[in-house]
Design a protein with these regions (language model features):
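Aromatic/hydrophobic pocket-lining residues that form π-stacking "cages" and hydrophobic walls in ligand
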Residues: 40
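Short amphipathic alpha-helices and their capping loops
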Residues: 1-28, 35
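His-Asp-centered acyl/peptidyl-transfer active-site segments
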Residues: 15, 23-26, 43-52, 66-176, ...
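Extended, hydrophobic beta-loop-alpha segments that form or line the acyl/peptidyl-thioester binding
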Residues: 71-78, 110-112, 181-245
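Generic structural detector for well-ordered beta-strands
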Residues: 29-31, 101-103, 192
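Active-site catalytic microenvironments for nucleophilic, acid-base chemistry
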Residues: 61-66, 101, 227-230
């Protein structure tokens, strides 16, 4: 962002340039064990939270930690994918994503922060048929940001579909799914979280190699897990304390 402020001559600019030249994307997957996954699922069930919102809290807390405690964090959350039969072979599909912006102080306890994100998401879902492209245009007009800039660098998709075969005749056939990058993307970091056959979860990080390395994804996953499991173990602990202890 500091580089973008210098480039555009605006010391108060709240947006960074989107990489438009070197668009190569790499993928790094991490597998979360079934027992640990079940702990997250149980926490969500017991506190009436969605897994998406818990994951958003983990990402935003990490971003806050590495940005000097920044309280104002926005993450783009994909809320639906729509595809037609023709799109199966066209190389694309229609996706709908919305920015989830929350301002959470370090004094806020973990559970309250999760509910704050959930309340924000519930308000967003009411407008899930709104064109994301129009949102981008409106943000640019409202905040007077230059073209091809963005405040968001992280994107999330959670796929709540357990990988199980209901047909007992096919139950012994093992299944395996893996995400592959198409080689180019304008999104800095795109995380897809899905369930695995053994009851665990797969965290698939797609990242632009122009500015990010595999080690960056390793750190993101490591601290996300530290934050989430610290939070569900001690939901009354403040976000600030969690950031200090992890």
């Amino acid at each position: 962002m500091e580089e973008a402020r210098k480039r555009h001559g605006n010391p108060k600019l709240r947006a960074s340039d989107i990489e438009m030249n070197e668009l190569f994307v790499a993928v790094k997957d991490y597998h979360l064990e079934p027992y640990a996954t079940q702990n997250l699922m149980d926490f969500c069930m017991n506190h009436q939270l969605s897994m998406t919102n818990l994951l958003l809290l983990g990402i935003r807390t990490y971003l806050s930690k590495v940005n000097n405690g920044q309280e104002d964090i926005t993450i783009q959350n994909f809320i639906s994918r729509r595809s037609t039969h023709d799109e199966w072979t066209s190389g694309g599909s229609r996706t709908i994503m919305f920015p989830c912006r929350t301002v959470i102080s370090p004094e806020t306890d973990f559970l309250s922060a999760a509910y704050e994100i959930q309340n924000m998401q519930n308000r967003i879902y009411m407008h899930s048929n709104y064109d994301p492209a129009l949102i981008v245009d409106e943000m640019r007009k409202r905040y007077h940001t230059p073209e091809h800039t963005s405040y968001e660098s992280c994107y999330l998709t959670y796929q709540p579909m357990p990988v199980k075969v209901e047909n007992e005749m096919l139950g012994t056939i093992r299944q395996h799914a893996k995400w592959f990058a198409n080689g180019a993307a304008t999104k800095k970091m795109y995380l897809t979280v899905s369930h695995t056959e053994d009851g665990g979860m797969n965290f698939s990080y797609h990242y632009q190699t122009a500015h990010l390395e595999e080690h960056d994804m390793e750190l993101l996953y490591y601290y996300m897990m530290r934050i989430l499991f610290k939070g569900i173990a001690e939901p009354d602990m403040s976000i600030g304390e969690i950031m200090e202890q992890v």
